[in-house]
Structure formats: C-alpha cells, structure tokens
C-alpha cells in the first residue's frame, strides 16, 4: 500500500509538472510562430527595361502610400538601403534602383554607353516614368546627390521633399581630401593609373564604411568585401574611372543646385555621419545656409551611416515625413 501510495503521489507530481510546462510553453511556441510569419510588406526584387537597359530595383510598402525614392552612392547599390526597407515599409512606398553599371542593373560597355551623371540622371528619370512615380520624396546618398539634383532640375514638380545623407552640393564640402581627385580632373592621362589603384583598393573600400569610427566592432566587413568584389569585375575599372572623371561636372553645377534650393526652399532633411571621412564636416551647415529651415541631424555613423545608425535614421525619417 505504501508503494502504491508513493506511486500515486509521484504520478500526481509528474502530471502537475507537465501541466505547468504546457502552460508556460504555449505562449513561447505561439510567440515563435508569430516571429516566423511573413512580414506584411516584404521586399520585392524586380527588373524593368529602361532605354534598352535592364534596371534592377528593390520595392516595398503599399503603393498608395507616400513614395520614398532612394538613390545610392559609390560603390554601392540599392542594397545599402535594406536597413530602411525593413524599418519603413509599413508606412511608406520605398523604391531603390541600381544605376546602369552598378549592382544588378546592366553594365553596358563604356565604349558604347556614356557613364556621366547627366546620362545616369536621364535613365533614372525615365525609370520613374516607367514605374509611374509622379510624386516622391528623394533620398540621396553620395552619388545620389548629383544624380538626384539633376533629376530635380529636370522635373521639380515631382519632388515633395529632399533627404540628403552624406552627399555634397557645395564646393567646400569636398574638403582637402579631394586635392588628388581634382588633379585627375585637370589631367586625366597623367593621374588615371594612380586614381584607379586607389579607387579600386580594398583599403579605400573599407575606409568608405569605417571612416574615423573608433568602434570597429560595429562594422560588418561583408559590406565592403562585397563591394570590393564588385569593383574588381570586368568593366568596373573603366566604368568607375569614367564616372569619377565626370564628377568635375558636379562641381560646375553646384551653383545651379544651390540657387534652386535658395529660390524654392524645399522641405529638406540633412543626415550626416559624424565619422564621415569622404567629405568635409562643414557641408551640413552649407545646406542650412541655402535652406534655413532645413533639419540637420548628425548621427552615430560614417559615410554609409545606415551601417551603424539605421534605427536612429529611420526614426528621423519617419518624423520628417509625417
């Protein structure tokens, strides 16, 4: 009888424990399943024919929501905006193309395709027309600045607001680092070999991301090693050196862009990485000189500030676009 009683008590104890475990495990399982559900606005990866070229782009968010058109920098692609896609697509329609010669878009032969900022801006304007994007907020990073400002001057009626992230529209914004690059513009033949060596090197590709940030552990090395691989593919040396030579035309156009901003006083948000090493730290205030009501935010990042400050930037963008 004692043995039977002991067995009964053990059985009740085991039963009680199993009930408790079931009670505690159910919410965990439910929570786990909830995490596995598809997001409401997944990113789509598409291509579209524009001017005889296959243009790759990322898209997410409801198409009837305000559109955010994101223009990438060098030597990046639309991939750089992935951190914003996952943070903003619940409320906004995000579209980020790869320029010709970048990312997953076509890389036409430089002997047959003019790699100039005028030409890329023209293709990007035609891209927006092909997608039916008639109104958008323009988000411009690095090369996105000269591409975007050309798009603005061609079709100012399409632009609702501007977001500038580490992109330059003032001569002083280039800073002392651009002395050797100006030498390339002055004499391409004498300086092209040195420029290519520097532009395509792993050290320079890494420096664009890390900049002066002392917190190296925050930076994912895959971001610059992937870009380094991309830069060392066939045609890239010719494509990038052509485009970098044409960068001199951006400096020539700065007064036009500044005049447009001073006249139109657009809604303007400037986001700048405090560890930016490619451009001069005076540039954000130069924008505010043109547009006194511009919002300026210095964030905890470098030239590619989304690498380390995506949460901060997403909050800033949400507040700006309300």
What are these regions (language model features)?
Residues 11-23:
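Bacterial N-terminal signal peptides
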Residues 293-322:
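Catalytic active-site module of serine/aspartate enzymes centered on a nucleophile-bearing elbow/loop
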Residues 75-83, 94:
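Serine-hydrolase catalytic-loop signature spanning alpha/beta hydrolases and amidase-signature enzymes
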Residues 70-73, 96:
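Structural cue for short, hydrophobic secondary-structure segments
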Residues 1-10:
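N-terminal secretory signal peptides that target proteins for export/translocation
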């Amino acid at each position: 009888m004692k043995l039977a009683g002991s067995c009964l008590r053990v059985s009740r104890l085991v039963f009680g424990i199993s009930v408790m475990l079931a009670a505690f495990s159910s919410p965990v399982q439910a929570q786990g399943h909830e995490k596995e559900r598809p997001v409401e606005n997944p990113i789509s990866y598409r291509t579209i024919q524009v001017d005889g070229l296959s243009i790759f782009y990322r898209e997410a968010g409801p198409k009837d929501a305000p559109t955010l058109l994101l223009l990438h920098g060098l030597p990046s692609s639309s991939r750089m905006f992935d951190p914003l896609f996952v943070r903003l697509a619940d409320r906004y329609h995000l579209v980020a193309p790869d320029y010709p010669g970048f990312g997953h878009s076509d890389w036409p032969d430089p002997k047959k395709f003019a790699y100039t900022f005028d030409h890329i801006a023209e293709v990007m304007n035609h891209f927006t027309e092909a997608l039916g994007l008639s109104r958008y907020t323009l988000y411009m990073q690095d090369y996105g600045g000269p591409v975007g400002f050309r798009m603005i001057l061609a079709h100012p009626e399409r632009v609702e607001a501007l977001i500038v992230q580490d992109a330059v529209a003032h001569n002083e914004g280039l800073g002392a680092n651009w002395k050797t690059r100006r030498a390339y513009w002055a004499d391409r033949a004498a300086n092209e070999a040195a420029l290519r060596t520097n532009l395509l090197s792993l050290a320079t590709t890494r420096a664009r991301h890390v900049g002066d940030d002392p917190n190296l552990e925050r930076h994912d090395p895959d971001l610059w090693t992937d870009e380094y691989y991309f830069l060392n593919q066939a045609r890239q040396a010719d494509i990038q050196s052509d485009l970098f030579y044409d960068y001199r035309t951006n400096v020539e156009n700065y007064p036009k862009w500044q005049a447009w901003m001073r006249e139109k006083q657009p809604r303007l948000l400037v986001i700048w990485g405090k560890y930016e090493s490619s451009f001069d730290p005076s540039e954000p205030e130069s924008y505010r000189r043109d547009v006194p009501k511009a919002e300026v935010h210095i964030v905890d990042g470098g030239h590619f500030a989304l690498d380390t400050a995506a949460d901060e930037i997403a909050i800033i963008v949400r507040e700006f676009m309300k």
